[in-house]
Structures are given as C-alpha cells and as structure tokens.
C-alpha cells in the first residue's frame, strides 16, 4: 500500500527528528557523556571545539551530517525491532513541512523519516538487493 495507508494502519509510527542546532546538541552530549566518560580536560576540549567545528559547516554539510546520523539511528532501531520479531518500514516520502506543526515540535528539530512499527502474520521476505559484485569494486 501507499505510505499514507501504512501510517494509518500501523499501531505505532515513529517520527525521527534531528537537532539542527549542532552546537547546542554537542554541548549537551559532552555534558551528559562527559560526566561518566571524560576527564575534566577532555570535557573542556569537547565543549570548546565541537561547537566551533559545527559552526564552520555550510548548509549542505549540515544537512548531510544530520541525514547520515538519522540513517544510523534508524538502522539501529530497525535492527533492534527485527531482533524482537517486530516488523518495521522506513518511510522517506512524506510531507515534512507539516510534521513539526502537527506534533507541536520546535522548528529547530528537522523531521527526517518515519518508521511504521507492528507485528505481522505475514511471512516476510527480504526485499531485492543488488548483488554485492555490482555495488562493490575490489581494487
């Protein structure tokens, strides 16, 4: 069915957002992770250098960074769901311009993708993938 049908029929739909304020996000991650994992010196390094690094990103670099991170999160989530016997489907084709308003989420957060989640009685078959030798070239 269509993406809209999947969303309507799924018991759960996850909307995955990225935080477009990379500097603020980096500081928060450094603070939270730093308490457990970083020396004071390391924490200071991350608090000063990561925000400055992100500030140098142009719009395309920022968009690529956010999309890549969203993809990694989605992949891990889908693998964890699959491991628990729960079906899921990643949806990229949706009207991103309305999601923040409908869900009342600050515009700072960018909708990246939706994941429909649920159990199914159908025997799931893997979707077609190109053969490895068509996508990887050994040199």
Briefly describe each language-model feature range:
Residues 1-139:
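Acidic, surface-exposed loops and disordered segments
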């Amino acid at each position: 069915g269509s993406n809209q049908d999947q969303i309507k029929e799924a018991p759960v739909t996850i909307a995955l957002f990225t935080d477009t304020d990379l500097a603020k996000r980096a500081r928060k991650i450094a603070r939270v992770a730093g308490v457990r994992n970083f020396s004071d010196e390391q924490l200071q390094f991350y608090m000063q250098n990561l925000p400055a690094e992100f500030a140098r990103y142009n719009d395309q670099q920022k968009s690529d960074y956010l999309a890549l991170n969203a993809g990694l999160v989605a992949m891990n989530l889908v693998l964890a769901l699959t491991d628990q016997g729960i079906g899921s489907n990643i949806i990229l084709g949706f009207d991103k311009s309305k999601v923040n308003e409908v869900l009342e989420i600050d515009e700072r957060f960018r909708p990246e993708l939706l994941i429909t989640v649920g159990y199914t009685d159908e025997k799931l078959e893997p979707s077609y993938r190109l053969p490895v030798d068509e996508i990887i070239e050994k040199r």
